[in-house]
Amino acid sequence: MSNSEMYRPRSSYFFAGAIYILCAGLIGQSFFSESLEGVLTTIAWCLLVAYVFHLSFVRPKVTFFDEGITITNPLKEITVGWGEIEDIGARYSMYIQVGGEKIYAWAAQAPGRYHSRNIHASELRGLNLPDPLNIRAGESPRTHSGVAVALARIRRDAFISKNLIGCESSTHFNRGGATTLAILIAVTCLITFA
């Protein structure tokens, strides 16, 4: 993986940080107003919520490199070489199409359907869109998905023009994340309902 570039929206850190602060405040407040059982229940629920937000907002990212792309979602990490990608686009989020299957990137969410009304023609220069007169809202350069799609198309075009060899495709399941999530759910249910 040479010349790698990672894309993750900065707003993800803001949302996750806000949840962490809220959970810390709830835990602090419970020490003053709850019994030991209430404090433990609050800690369990706050840890579960904070970890779910960590998986949903902080972990997802898209990594572009000369040979391919890696899409990291909460419980899966998919690496695909540029030569295997049939299409790059954005519907609900940025996606790549490989072998007829669409792989969506959680890190590059598309905006609402009315966003395309606010796009000006000057924003589309140099993006090499297939049909610049009929742009999807998710391909706007002012959106998370639009930035990721533009970066992916630039990297794929460079790959094709240089006749490089793509990387091998791989899929990795986030066992550690899934195990931690399952343990937190079990402990939270045990503390809450026992």
Language model: regions and residue ranges:
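Short, aromatic-rich membrane-interface segments at the entry and exit
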Residues: 35-42
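A membrane-cytosol interface segment of integral membrane proteins
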Residues: 102-164
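N-terminal membrane-targeting/pre-transmembrane regions
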Residues: 1-34, 142, 149-194
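Single-pass alpha-helical transmembrane signal-anchor segments
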Residues: 24-25, 42-56, 183-189
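Short acidic, Gly/Pro-enriched loop/turn segments at secondary-structure junctions
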Residues: 92-103
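Short beta-strand segments
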Residues: 78-80, 101-104
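Conserved beta-hairpin
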Residues: 51-82, 86-94
